[in-house]
Amino acid sequence: MYKKGTILVLAYLLIATAVCQLSYKEGHCPLRNSVSKCIPRCVSDYQCSFNEKCCPNKCGSESCVQASPINTGNGYKGSNDDVYCAGVKCGPYEKCQFDRKTKREKCVRT
């Protein structure tokens, strides 16, 4: 038979896992300068509707927007965020974009 403490620890871990999954949603944030919607403001993905993420906007805050299927990063030289496309690191001033002809992601100039 399990001890009462072991069962409580397992229950706590299950609840913590469920909460963590609710606060992060799949997908990537679009480029900050392409998010013109400044409201509603948010702090975490769990505050947004089912298909939206909490992402930086051009107003300097974060708001709920439709998630992007690809990682666009911010693509600017000197940023701390590297941008990768299909496992390849994009250069400075490049972002990851889906090419409709080849049906693949590729690095393009911003």
UniProtKB/Swiss-Prot annotation:
Residues 22-68 form the WAP domain. Keywords: Antibiotic, Antimicrobial, Disulfide bond, Fungicide, Protease inhibitor, Secreted, Serine protease inhibitor, Signal. Disulfide bonds join C29-C55, C38-C59, C42-C54, C48-C64. Pfam families: WAP. Its main location: secreted. One of its GO terms (biological process) is killing of cells of another organism. One of its GO terms (cellular component) is extracellular region. It is found in: Secreted. Residues 1-20 form the signal peptide. Expressed by the venom gland. GO terms for molecular function: peptidase inhibitor activity; serine-type endopeptidase inhibitor activity. Belongs to the venom waprin family. Cys-rich waprin subfamily. Antimicrobial peptides with activity against Gram-positive and Gram-negative bacteria as well as fungi. Recognizes carbohydrates in the microbial cell walls, and induces structural damage to them. Also inhibits microbial serine proteases subtilisin A and proteinase K, as well as human and porcine elastases. Carbohydrates that are recognized are LPS, mannan, peptidoglycan, and N-acetl-D-glucosamine. Negative results: does not inhibit plasmin and thrombin. Does not show any hemolytic activity on mouse erythorcytes. This is Waprin-Thr1. It comes from Apis mellifera (Honeybee).
